[in-house]
Amino acid sequence: MGKKLVMAQRRGETRALCLGVAMVVGAVITYYILGTTVLPLYQKSVWTQESTCHLIETNIRDQEELEGKRVPQYPCLWVNVSSVGRWAVLYHTEDTRDQNHQCSYIPSSLDNYQVARADVEKVRARFHENQDFFCFSTTRENETSVLYRRLYGPQSLLFSLFWPTFLLTGGLLIIVMVKINQSLSILAAQR
C-alpha cells in the first residue's frame, strides 16, 4: 500500500508541477503580447496632464463622413471647451481624434441614423448638465485639443497586467508548494 501511495503522490505532484509551469508560461506569453501591444500605446500617449475643462459650446453636425466605413453620413458632436487658460476642442478618446478631426464624439451605432442621433443628443445633454469636468491635455504649447477619457492610461495598463500577474503568482505558488511537499516527503522518509 505504501508503494501505491507514493506512486499516486508522484503522479499528483507531476500534474501539479505541469499546471504550475503551464501557468507561468502562459503568463510570460501574455506579458510579451501586452508588452508589444498595450505598453507602446501607453508610452506614446501624450495626454498626461489632467486638468479641468469648462464647456463653451456644443454643436451637432449631421453631414459627416467617416473614412474607412460604409456609413455615408452620421451625426457627430463637436464640443469646444476652455482648458488650462486656452480654447480647445474636446475629443472623447484618442481614437475619436484619429477617426475624424471634426467630431468630438462619434456614436457607437452608425447603422441607424435615428439611434445615432439620439445617442449624440444624450451625450450633448450630459455635457450641458455638467459644464465643468476633468479632461486630459498635453504639455505641448500649440495643441488645441483635449481628451475626455484616455484609452491608454495607467488604469488600463494596470488592468491589463492584473490577470497575467495573478497567473504568474499562482503558477509560482503551485511550483513552490509542490517542491516544499517533495522535500518534506524526503525528510519524513529519511527518519
UniProtKB/Swiss-Prot annotation:
Keywords, alphabetical:
Glycoprotein, Ion channel, Ion transport, Membrane, Transmembrane, Transmembrane helix, Transport
Q: Does the keyword Transport apply?
A: yes
Q: Which domain of life is it from?
A: Eukaryota
Kindly indicate whether the keyword ATP-binding belongs to this entry.
no
**What is one Pfam family matched by this protein?**
CaKB
Q: How is it modified after translation?
A: N-glycosylated.
Predominant place of localization:
membrane
Query: GO CC annotation: what is one?
Result: voltage-gated potassium channel complex
Which parts of the sequence lie on the Cytoplasmic side of the lipid bilayer?
2-18, 179-191
UniProt cross-references to InterPro entries, sorted A to Z: K_chnl_Ca-activ_BK_bsu
An MF annotation (GO) of this entry: calcium-activated potassium channel activity
Positions annotated with a glycan in the UniProt record: N80, N142
User: What's a GO biological-process term for it?
Assistant: detection of calcium ion
Question: What is the membrane topology noted in the UniProt record heading this document?
Answer: Multi-pass membrane protein
The membrane spanning regions, by residue number, are: 19-39, 158-178
* Sequence ranges on the Extracellular membrane side: 40-157
Q: Where does the UniProt annotation locate this protein?
A: Membrane
Membership in a protein family = Belongs to the KCNMB (TC 8.A.14.1) family. KCNMB1 subfamily.
Q: What does this protein do?
A: Regulatory subunit of the calcium activated potassium KCNMA1 (maxiK) channel. Modulates the calcium sensitivity and gating kinetics of KCNMA1, thereby contributing to KCNMA1 channel diversity. Increases the apparent Ca(2+)/voltage sensitivity of the KCNMA1 channel. It also modifies KCNMA1 channel kinetics and alters its pharmacological properties. It slows down the activation and the deactivation kinetics of the channel. Acts as a negative regulator of smooth muscle contraction by enhancing the calcium sensitivity to KCNMA1.
What interactions and quaternary structure are annotated? Interacts with KCNMA1 tetramer. There are probably 4 molecules of KCMNB1 per KCNMA1 tetramer.
Protein name, UniProt field:
Calcium-activated potassium channel subunit beta-1
Q: Which organism is it from?
A: Bos taurus
